């Protein structure tokens, strides 16, 4: 006899590229950064250096627009061997500031899904990683905040983080559902805890969130092509 799946006591949504577009804004800014620094390398080289600086500094600055701004400045210093001027750095800073206040428009299906889950009385949470001020601002600008009973902004999404969240809210893994676009951050650590994970693919994907296919072998998670399909899965 199959044991029925318990009703979720907590349904968490990732924010960036799940509730609203985020990566396209960063990609657009990176294209402009490459153009500004074109005298110091080709596009592939500059993009690679920018990501390497970000990755190297993640333990110091974490994720988000401010970290990206610092990476732009450090990359410019490296590519110019320290010769970059304040006049040349200012456009980079201006680009970074745009990432802190771009308009937030919910992705297709988001309002429909949140409205229906709220009607059903489901307990909803935003669970996102990044800079506290930046992510709080995005939630506010999105107009979606009233759908969520809880907002959790964390510095990293791994098994330890999810376990802390479950413990804090008194929820067992089988009573928790995580919905997000990142296999690395939203799916793998949740599935490894024995909780339910729903993958909603989004493109483009930041290189840092890519997962080799072999890491997915044997991992139990559910994939939907559009967010509205989660309403059927969670019925």
Q: Model segments located where?
A:
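Asp-based, Mg2+/Mn2+-dependent phosphohydrolase catalytic module
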Residues: 1-8, 111, 115-119, 131-235
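Short helix-capping segments at alpha-helix termini
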Residues: 39-43, 81-83, 143-146, 170
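A metal-dependent, Asp-based hydrolase signature
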Residues: 48-98
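Active-site neighborhood of HAD-like aspartate-dependent phosphohydrolases
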Residues: 2-49
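Short amphipathic alpha-helical segments at helix boundaries and their inter-helical linkers
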Residues: 58-67, 100-108, 161-164, 189-196
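Short, acidic loop-to-helix structural element flanking the phosphoryl-transfer center
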Residues: 7, 65-67, 86-125, 159
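An amphipathic alpha-helix signature
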Residues: 26-34, 69, 73, 132
């Amino acid at each position: 006899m199959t044991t029925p799946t318990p009703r979720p006591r907590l349904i968490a949504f990732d924010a960036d590229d799940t509730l609203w577009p985020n990566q396209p804004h960063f990609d657009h800014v990176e294209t402009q950064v490459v153009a500004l620094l074109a005298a110091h390398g080709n596009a592939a080289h500059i993009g690679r250096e920018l990501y390497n600086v970000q990755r190297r500094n993640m333990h110091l600055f974490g994720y988000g627009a401010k970290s990206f701004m610092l990476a732009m400045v450090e990359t410019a210093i490296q590519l110019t061997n320290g010769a970059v001027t304040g006049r040349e750095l200012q456009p980079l800073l201006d680009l970074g500031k745009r990432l802190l206040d771009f308009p937030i428009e919910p992705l297709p299906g988001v309002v429909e899904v949140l409205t229906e889950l709220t009607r059903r009385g489901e307990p909803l949470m935003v669970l996102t990683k990044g800079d506290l001020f930046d992510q709080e601002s995005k939630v506010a600008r999105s107009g979606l905040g009233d759908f969520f009973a809880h907002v959790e902004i964390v510095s990293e999404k791994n098994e330890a983080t999810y376990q802390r969240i479950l413990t804090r809210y008194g929820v067992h893994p089988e009573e928790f559902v995580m919905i997000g676009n990142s296999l690395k951050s939203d799916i793998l650590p949740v599935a490894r805890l024995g909780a339910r994970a729903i993958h909603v693919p989004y493109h483009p994907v930041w290189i840092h969130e890519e997962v080799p296919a072999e890491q997915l072998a044997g991992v139990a998670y559910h994939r939907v092509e559009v967010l509205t399909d989660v309403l059927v899965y969670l019925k």
